[in-house]
Design a protein with these regions (language model features):
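Acidic/glycine-rich C-terminal interaction modules and beta/coil loop segments
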Residues: 2-100
Length: 100
C-alpha cells in the first residue's frame, strides 16, 4: 500500500468516542503522517495534536485567524480552542485500521 511507503508514518491507538461520527471508534488504530508545518494543513483535516494538560488528541483541525479549533466528530464534545502556538500538530490521518 502507498500508505506504508510514506516516511516516518506512526500509529496511535484510539481511546474514546470523540471521533465516532467520522467512523473512528475506540480501539481503532490510526496511521498518521508527520506534519512539519501546520500552515500546510487544510481546515477539516483530521490530526493528532499534543495539547498541554490533555496529552495527544485526534480531532478535526480548523484554523481561524490566530486560533486553532480542534473539533470532535461527536456532538457530545466541545471544541478545544487554543492559540496556534499552544499546541503541537503531530500528524495528519492517513488510514484507520480496525480489528473485526
Amino acid at each position: 500500500s502507498d500508505v506504508l511507503k510514506k516516511k516516518n508514518v506512526f500509529a496511535l491507538s484510539v481511546n474514546g468516542d470523540s471521533m465516532i461520527d467520522a467512523c473512528i471508534a475506540h480501539g481503532d488504530m490510526v496511521l498518521m503522517e508527520p506534519v512539519s508545518d501546520s500552515y500546510s494543513l487544510r481546515n477539516g483535516t483530521i490530526v493528532s495534536a499534543l495539547v498541554p494538560g490533555l496529552g495527544t488528541t485526534l480531532k478535526y483541525f480548523v484554523k481561524k485567524g490566530d486560533k486553532v479549533y480542534l473539533e470532535a466528530a461527536n456532538q457530545n464534545y466541545d471544541p478545544i480552542v487554543l492559540d496556534s502556538n499552544q499546541l503541537i500538530i503531530q500528524g495528519r490521518l492517513l488510514a484507520v485500521w480496525r480489528k473485526v
